[in-house]
């Protein structure tokens, strides 16, 4: 190790320690242990701090996000739009150095990590996207895409089940462009890993199909770490796990103990570190000039590499004008012109069809038009109907099951990993529009990943079928009740529950055009009629008046399968002398973004509003005065019988509508949309 290397590693360590000390909050242990690995990995990486969206950059993911003082120190030293002053504001309100990495706030952070295990799954998604992208656009003598994904992960990540799901799939997919580094420091918050984590990780990853490299002294041996990277790159048909034997809190008086994990070092400890490593013990946030020069040199080399890539891409566009134009369009974040003309349009004369089938029809129409759409299912393809006819599977060619240019991903029964991998695909860039299918109830298995989709502003899409008691015989274990309320309550998630074909097309239009908001499409197993008065344009507002009634006594607002039920209830109400209108509200988030004038035209003052949805009523008081829903678990049986059991029939809806009319008769009724703030 050269003296500059040693000085650089010490600088990384001390910047992290100083940042945590300044905040009086954070995690110094992992940065002290992983600094040599970070130094070695970044020296091998191809990136340009001045162009963080260059598509052929290598990606770095910090799965153990609590070690973010390490990442921030690297970003500062390499000249990203992050400075020592930002480090001094570590974990402070409004800073660019939050308590865990956030891709929306931290220049150079590829993904948002913190919940353990998510980052390694994101890394799998990034590597998958890179492989698909390369197989689609690379040509002989034109390696447009040949980047690597590097992931740091800790024992906590390995304990989380989601990492096992994703690592298993990565091994099957033979993602040789993925290199993960396990910080094997044998410490957890509760103490030694001997208390809860004693499995043979290496044997497990070998069984997944990963290549293994071990570095026995990752505290100091950067030559071995660099050699591990070189070895990993030679193994092109397996992802690699590099076991880094490290000491948590290396150099600290508390090194090797759980006490150094998540608390600032004491002042005397910091001083002895600085003295030991040749720094002024009274100075904080020091960056020696020779370290800056060394890192600037690597950046300059990388900028030359990017310039060569730019020239390569220019030549590519001349030799392959159609592909080049398509690729440029994707890099510009634009969709194909008039792609939405492919969306199916329906009339009431068309047959009743389940919205999951309508979803399949949409996918079959738009996938040929939009090459950036890729997707799959968590082993429910025949039920979710997520595979468009003729779509090739994304598989290693050696399996004989597909190839890397394939656009259909077999996720297996791995819902949580699927969600986190989708986040990684979105993080890769190139305008990927990716979707994953499962039953709506099992999107809950992936709640951690879904929440990070929303926080990260990744526009991924869940094709969530079997959306209610309408799935029938599988019973309450599979019938979602609270699921929609949960995800509607999560900020920045568009939860669509379309009622017919036009609304399903509108849902996909919203999802494909989204740039910052994930979507969940809740779709039926049972057939639904095509509605009179629906249209893609109307549904695209998130809510609209389906049945207009002058001087209505009541408005019934519903979603999905209950919209046609509400329409059927009108005849019953008419027989009772009650005039009712019907509003379809397929997506609350989109509706909420409309003008106040428009929203009040749909859900106006002066008329009581009843919501009808065969789910939890939680959250519906924002849009209705009275709520008819299902605040209990469902039942196993034939769907029509279950609907009848819970009185979700035209008569059941009409009964509750009549009671609502009677309750509000003679009273001043203010729209539930109105509020003081």
UniProtKB/Swiss-Prot annotation:
Sequence positions that bind thiamine diphosphate: 66, 114-116, 156, 185, 261, 415, 442
Site residues by UniProt (Important for catalytic activity): 27, 261
Free-text cofactor note: Binds 1 Mg(2+) ion per subunit. Can also utilize other divalent metal cations, such as Ca(2+), Mn(2+) and Co(2+). Binds 1 thiamine pyrophosphate per subunit.
Top-rank EC class of the record's enzyme: transferase
Active site positions: 415 (proton donor)
Gene3D superfamilies, A to Z: 3.40.50.920, 3.40.50.970
Source domain of life: Eukaryota
InterPro entries according to UniProt: THDP-binding (IPR029061), Transketo_C/PFOR_II (IPR009014), Transketolase-like_C_2 (IPR055152), Transketolase-like_Pyr-bd (IPR005475), Transketolase_bac-like (IPR005478), Transketolase_BS (IPR020826), Transketolase_CS (IPR049557), Transketolase_fam (IPR033247)
Record keywords: Calcium, Magnesium, Metal-binding, Thiamine pyrophosphate, Transferase
A GO MF term: metal ion binding
Positions annotated to bind Mg(2+): 155, 185, 187
Cofactor: Mg(2+); Ca(2+); Mn(2+); Co(2+)
Keyword Magnesium belongs to the record: yes
Binding site residues for substrate: 27, 261, 356, 383, 466, 474, 525
GO annotation, cellular component aspect: cytosol; nucleus
Statement: the UniProt record of this protein carries the keyword Nucleotide-binding: no
Documented EC number(s): 2.2.1.1
GO terms classed as biological process: pentose-phosphate shunt
Function: Catalyzes the transfer of a two-carbon ketol group from a ketose donor to an aldose acceptor, via a covalent intermediate with the cofactor thiamine pyrophosphate.
Family note: Belongs to the transketolase family.
Quaternary state and interactors: Homodimer.
PANTHER family given in the database record: TRANSKETOLASE, TRANSKETOLASE 1-RELATED
The name this protein goes by in its record: Transketolase
Record gene name: TKT
């Amino acid at each position: 190790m050269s003296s500059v290397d040693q000085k650089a590693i010490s600088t990384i360590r001390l910047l992290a320690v100083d940042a945590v000390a300044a905040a009086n909050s954070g995690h110094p242990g992992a940065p002290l242990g992983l600094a040599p690995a970070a130094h070695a990995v970044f020296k091998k990486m191809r990136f340009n701090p001045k162009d963080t969206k260059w598509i052929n950059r290598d990606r770095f993911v910090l799965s153990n996000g609590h070690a973010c003082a390490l990442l921030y120190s690297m970003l500062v030293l390499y000249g990203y739009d992050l400075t020592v002053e930002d480090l001094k504001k570590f974990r402070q309100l409004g800073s660019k150095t939050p308590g865990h990495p956030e891709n929306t706030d931290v220049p150079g952070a590829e993904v948002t990590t913190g919940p353990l295990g998510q980052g390694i799954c994101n890394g799998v998604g990034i590597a998958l996207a890179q492989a698909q992208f390369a197989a689609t656009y690379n040509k002989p003598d034109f390696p447009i895409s040949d980047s690597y994904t590097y992931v740091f992960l800790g024992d906590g990540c390995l304990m989380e089940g989601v990492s096992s799901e994703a690592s298993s799939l990565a091994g099957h997919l033979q993602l040789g462009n993925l290199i993960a580094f396990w910080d094997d420091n044998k410490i957890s918050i509760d103490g030694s890993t001997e208390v809860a984590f004693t499995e043979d990780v290496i044997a497990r990853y070998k069984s997944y199909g990963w290549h293994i490299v071990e570095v026995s002294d990752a505290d100091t041996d950067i030559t071995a770490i660099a050699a591990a990277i070189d070895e990993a790159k030679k193994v092109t048909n397996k992802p690699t796990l590099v076991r880094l034997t490290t000491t948590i809190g290396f150099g600290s008086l508390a090194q090797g103990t759980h006490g150094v994990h998540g608390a600032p070092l004491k002042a005397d400890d910091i001083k002895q570190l600085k003295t030991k490593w040749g720094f002024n013990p009274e100075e904080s946030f020091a960056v020696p000039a020779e370290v800056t020069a060394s890192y600037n040199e690597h950046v300059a080399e990388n900028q030359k590499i990017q310039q060569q890539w730019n020239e390569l891409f220019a030549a590519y566009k001349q030799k392959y004008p159609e592909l080049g134009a398509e690729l440029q369009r994707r890099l510009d974040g634009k969709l194909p012109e008039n792609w939405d003309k492919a969306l199916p349009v329906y009339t009431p004369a068309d047959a009743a069809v389940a919205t999951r089938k309508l979803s399949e029809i949409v996918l079959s129409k738009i996938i040929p038009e939009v090459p950036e759409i890729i997707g799959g299912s968590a082993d429910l393809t025949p039920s979710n109907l997520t595979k468009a006819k003729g779509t090739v599977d994304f598989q290693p060619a050696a399996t004989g099951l597909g190839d890397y240019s394939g656009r259909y991903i077999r996720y297996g029964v791995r819902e949580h990993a699927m969600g986190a991998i989708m986040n990684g695909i979105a993080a890769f860039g190139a305008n990927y529009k990716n979707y994953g299918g499962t039953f709506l109830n099992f999107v809950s298995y992936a709640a951690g990943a879904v929440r990070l989709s929303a926080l990260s502003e990744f526009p991924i899409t869940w094709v969530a079928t079997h959306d209610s008691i309408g799935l029938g015989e599988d019973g309450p274990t599979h019938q979602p009740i609270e699921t929609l309320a949960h995800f509607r309550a999560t900020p920045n998630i568009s939860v669509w529950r379309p009622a017919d074909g036009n609304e399903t097309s509108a849902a996909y239009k919203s999802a494909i055009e989204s740039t910052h908001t994930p979507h969940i499409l809740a779709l039926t197993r049972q057939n639904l009629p095509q509605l009179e008065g629906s249209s893609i344009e109307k549904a695209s507002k998130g809510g609209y008046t389906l049945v207009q009634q002058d001087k209505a006594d009541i408005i019934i607002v519903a979603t999905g399968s209950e919209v046609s039920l509400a329409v059927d209830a009108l005849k019953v109400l008419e027989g009772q002398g009650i005039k009712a209108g019907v509003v379809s509200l397929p997506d609350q988030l989109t509706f909420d973004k409309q003008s106040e004038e428009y929203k009040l035209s749909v859900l106006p003052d002066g008329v009581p509003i009843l919501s009808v949805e065969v789910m939890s009523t939680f959250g519906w008081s924002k849009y209705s005065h009275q709520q008819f829903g299902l605040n209990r678990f469902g039942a196993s049986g034939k769907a029509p019988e279950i609907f009848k059991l819970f009185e979700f029939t035209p008569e059941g809806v009409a009964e509750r509508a009549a009671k609502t009319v009677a309750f509000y008769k003679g009273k001043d009724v203010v729209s539930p949309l109105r509020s003081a703030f």
